[in-house]
């Protein structure tokens, strides 16, 4: 059984989340470009250890070359590796994209499933990727834990864990559900502009009084 949420954490949550809404009001958008649901799944697989900007450059060509789910499922592995090479870890990613798109056709009639168990049963799909899909395709409240969310949630004292799954459940426990979906994109925006990993602009930060570091 989880211990009750402390007064201090409750106080921070009540102040920090509305401030994020104030400074990043339209942040339920997705940084990865896609037009079809399965394209977001592929883009998210590619985004592991890679910037969203780089993924968007690659998928602009990739989604034209493979315009259907079937074309991905039938792709040549060596060719796919070259197509996505610049995203890094391209051998694993190419294999996972082909296996994943085949599974969608064979097991899910070419449709993306919405439940976390089915999504994470697909090759290359962990909870983070599944939650991106659940948030942006199905509008199911989910917390996506990426490097920005991990780092900044630790700084704010919302969690002291380094484990993305633990962080996800801790944040779900302390945040009202209506904030779950947009917390990730707001924190990414904050992490890119103000709370940068290497050179945080603490003097400009509207959250500095709630920050533990």
Positions of predicted regions on the chain:
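Catalytic cores of DNA base-excision repair glycosylases
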Residues: 4-213
